[in-house]
């Protein structure tokens, strides 16, 4: 236990130490200032601007920004859909894999990677060619991450600017994010992963003879380059079906630490970016403190539950007093619990252990974090703007308590912003619960359940929470590669992405037009520790009120049955 706690402390220390300078650098990038490597980046970016006939100096109001974003993402989804259905006729397919078997699986995968979800209802090494993995999935990993960051920055601009309707240039934001932030870090991360044993090649699969004399096929591929952006962009889709528990994706404890670090370094850095751009670092610190408070709480619950173990399994003398089922011995309870918490804290979804094998409360933590919108540090951009919706609700509640018009950063939070905030929070929640309920009541939905009882309900809840939350991890006992789940979870991913982005950009546009009022004696200090605690409380209360009944029938009952030694 001591080693595990030291790992947790070291991880947070390294994360914060690196996120601070990265956050300051990202502020310069998104303020359109010159950065290191300007002589290299500027000409490269100008090529893209000229190809697209875009003037990066032309700023956009929120509706134009949003329209460009939606059209760009729709075209990306369409291109990936077509690529999957034609890969058999294209190069870089040494295994001669056929086209993706059904249109609904291709639709689900295209929606998944475009929305930064990376839900995978297929096995990567037996379904997709190298070209589809590189030109399709990896490209969308970059672009979906850049899109999330662009929305977060547009919201920050809306909060800090005054008397204007402009939020920046969408094309400049995603290009600068990709060239100056994502690509440089990924190059370094790829080399580090290769040094640890992650494979990177375009070779055909290798047939070998095992020690027992049987034949085995070992998959090859350009894994390290995809692994880097998979984690850094909080995407999560694995090259292999086993994801980051596969030794070719995540071979050592050092690679495991690096992958967890990559998942959270940009989301954490964006809090420092926020403080820099609003000229008040305490605002960023307060939101970060609230996130860290929730993160430590969630990690503690997950780790304690897995460390305590499963008494039913322990009674058989199989794995001792800890819950090692579904976990890699090279990682153990500590690294597995930390990875599970990190990957669902962010909208990542990469896994180094099987979440379906976690105990009731151990699996509850990843599920609840996704249901809350993955706002505890969160994904690239998505975590920040998701948490800002809770910030607006907290400020609104505080305003009601003291009898003042709610204000944030000197701007009034009025009825229009509150309505948009509620929409951004309730539409995803309603989608999770409604689609889960319908799946439980239909034969097509029930056909995917491999475990009866409360755990079967947990698998369905987890699947739709993962889809709506744009996470992508799964309780893998759910048979998701069917017409029902491919279409429904595909729609859930689209709703979860754009039903939040559109209200956020609308809020940003409204806030940008307002003037900034100077603080006075009656202004609530949103940069204080009190506000950080209130914000964490609001996140938990909203989550409890919304999802507790469903969770009580799923993972909570699952845990109680386990403690009583009951199986189902």
Q: What do these predicted regions represent?
A:
Residues 1-568:
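Membrane-proximal intracellular helices of multi-pass ion channels
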């Amino acid at each position: 236990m001591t080693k595990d706690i030291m790992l947790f402390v070291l991880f947070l220390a390294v994360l914060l130490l690196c996120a601070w300078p990265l956050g300051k650098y990202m502020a310069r990038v998104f303020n359109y200032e010159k950065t290191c490597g300007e002589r290299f980046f500027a000409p490269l970016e100008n090529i893209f601007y000229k190809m697209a006939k875009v003037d990066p100096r032309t700023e956009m109001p929120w509706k134009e920004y949003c329209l460009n974003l939606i059209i760009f993402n729709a075209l990306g989804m369409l291109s990936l859909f077509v690529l999957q259905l034609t890969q058999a006729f294209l190069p870089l397919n040494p295994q001669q894999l056929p086209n993706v078997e059904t249109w609904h699986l291709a639709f689900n995968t295209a929606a998944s990677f475009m929305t930064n979800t990376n839900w995978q209802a297929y096995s990567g090494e037996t379904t997709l060619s190298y070209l589809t993995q590189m030109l399709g999935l990896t490209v969308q990993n970059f672009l979906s991450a850049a899109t999330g960051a662009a929305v977060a920055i547009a919201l920050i601009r809306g909060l800090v600017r005054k008397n204007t309707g402009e939020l920046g240039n969408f094309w400049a934001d995603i290009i600068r994010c990709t060239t100056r932030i994502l690509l440089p870090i990924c190059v370094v991360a790829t080399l580090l992963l290769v040094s640890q044993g992650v494979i990177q090649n375009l070779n055909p699969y290798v047939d070998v003879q095992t020690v027992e004399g049987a034949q085995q096929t070992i998959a090859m591929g350009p894994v390290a380059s995809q692994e880097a952006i998979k984690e850094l962009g909080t995407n999560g889709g694995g090259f292999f079906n086993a994801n980051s528990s596969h030794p070719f994706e995540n071979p050592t404890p050092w690679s495991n630490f690096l992958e967890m670090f990559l998942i959270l370094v940009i989301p954490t850095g964006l809090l420092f970016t926020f403080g820099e751009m609003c000229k008040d670092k305490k605002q960023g610190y307060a939101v970060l403190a609230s996130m860290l408070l929730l993160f430590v709480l969630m990690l503690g619950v997950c780790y304690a539950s897995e460390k305590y173990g499963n008494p039913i399994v322990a009674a058989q003398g199989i794995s001792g007093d800890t819950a090692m089922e579904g976990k890699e011995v090279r990682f153990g309870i500590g690294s597995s619990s930390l990875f599970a918490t990190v990957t669902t804290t962010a909208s990542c979804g990469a896994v180094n252990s099987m979440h379906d094998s976690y105990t009731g409360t151990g699996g509850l933590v990843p599920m609840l974090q996704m249901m809350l919108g993955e706002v505890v540090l969160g994904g690239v951009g998505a975590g920040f703007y998701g948490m800002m919706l809770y910030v607006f609700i907290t400020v609104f509640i505080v305003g009601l308590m003291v009898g003042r018009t709610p204000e944030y950063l000197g701007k009034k939070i009025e009825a229009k912003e509150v309505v948009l905030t509620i929409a951004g929070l309730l539409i995803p929640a309603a989608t999770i619960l409604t689609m889960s309920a319908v799946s439980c009541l239909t034969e097509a939905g029930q056909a995917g359940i491999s475990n009866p009882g409360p755990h079967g309900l947990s698998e369905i809840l987890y699947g739709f929470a993962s889809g709506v939350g744009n996470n992508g991890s799964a309780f893998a006992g759910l048979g998701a590669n069917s017409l029902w789940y491919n279409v429904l979870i595909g729609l859930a991913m689209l709703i979860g992405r754009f039903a939040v982005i559109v209200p956020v950009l609308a809020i940003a546009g409204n806030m940008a037009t307002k003037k900034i009022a100077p603080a006075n004696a009656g202004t609530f200090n949103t940069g204080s520790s009190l506000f950080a605690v209130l914000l964490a409380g609001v996140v938990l209360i909203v989550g409890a009120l919304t999802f507790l009944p469903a969770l009580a029938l799923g993972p909570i009952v699952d845990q109680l049955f386990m403690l009583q030694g009951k199986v189902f």
